[in-house]
Amino acid sequence: MPLLDIEPLDLGPDVKAVGLDLVEDDENREPVRGEDAARIWSRVLPAAAGEEPLVLDFFSHIDRVRDFCDRHQIGYRETTPRSIVIPAPEASALEALLDRFQGETFGARAGGPISAGDDGELERELARRGADAYHPAFPRYFFCAICGFEDGSLVLLSQKLWASEVIRRVRPVLQGLDVEVRLPA
């Protein structure tokens, strides 16, 4: 049975973060990948966001992301020639999107300026700096996330979420799936 370990991360004095690692429950602790991982992550992201609006930020391999979204009729917004913002699609489309692009590093945001429309400054910085652009911006949001699903990793940068709250949010949506959610000792 896969494990979803959720714990606070120490990324420095100015960054509050929660790390989520989806790994096999064995001595090797290899990342869980493939359809099962996409099914789990597609439930975790919206659950972490709760009632806050959620978007995905892609800042590499833009042509492939655009083509996938067009083929699957997933709405998106090209914010710069090198970045695409995807408002969180319905569950099955989100799962397909995460399955297709789990080998890429991309981002997600919830709350904050999303409700007001867009955050052009951050979106330009994402195109230029990738996930590093979230560091100065995350306090404006409910969370900013770095999705490294190939490595079984999701890092939530947030001043509003802590590990126990993330566990409380994700446990119910993962019931019925073969995964154990825990705070490592």
Positions of PLM-derived features:
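Structured alpha/beta or helical-core interaction and ligand-binding surfaces enriched in interleaved
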Residues: M1-A185
